């Protein structure tokens, strides 16, 4: 294993830990979505209505975990499940107005925290980070096909 790969792996571990800690802090700071709800609502916003099968292909979660997560967003009124408007048999999850509002509030808080963290970075450095993260995600998705919706 090359030293560069080992260092990259360690930095990804550290980043993952920082994100997990930030999610914990944000939940303690108020009425914030948990990580699974935030992820599901983002997917529905970007990808449009999705079936449980669509979500399973994207997230790679087992059925029981995904059912538990989708049940929670339904119970909290963040999404609703409707019949397929194109006539298919699958029922699809749709964002509700409440879900959109909560998602936007959480996104604003998340982006404000990120902007604060990167406040001393130049626009060029932020752009470089975005391109590098996008390239890393694309490489992962090419190797392990899970069709993550894009804006």
Where are these regions (language model features)?
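N-terminal leader segment of winged-helix/HTH proteins
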Residues: 1-38, 151
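Short, locally clustered residues in the helix-turn-helix/winged-helix DNA-binding domain
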Residues: 17, 42-46, 107, 134
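N-terminal helix-turn-helix DNA-binding core of bacterial DNA-binding proteins
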Residues: 21-65, 70, 75-76, 92
């Amino acid at each position: 294993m090359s030293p560069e790969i080992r260092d990259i792996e360690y930095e990804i571990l550290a980043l993952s830990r920082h994100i997990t800690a930030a999610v914990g802090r944000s939940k303690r700071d108020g009425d914030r979505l948990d990580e699974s709800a935030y992820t599901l609502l983002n997917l529905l916003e970007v990808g449009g209505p999705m079936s449980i099968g669509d979500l399973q292909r994207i997230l790679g979660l087992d059925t029981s975990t995904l059912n538990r997560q989708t049940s929670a967003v339904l119970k909290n009124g963040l999404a609703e499940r409707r019949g397929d408007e194109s006539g298919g048999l699958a029922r699809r999850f749709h964002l509700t107005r409440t879900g959109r509002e909560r998602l936007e509030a959480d996104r604003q808080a998340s982006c404000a925290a990120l902007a604060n963290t990167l406040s001393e970075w130049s626009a060029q450095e932020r752009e470089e980070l975005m391109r590098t993260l996008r390239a890393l995600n694309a490489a992962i998705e090419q190797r392990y096909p899970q069709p993550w919706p894009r804006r």
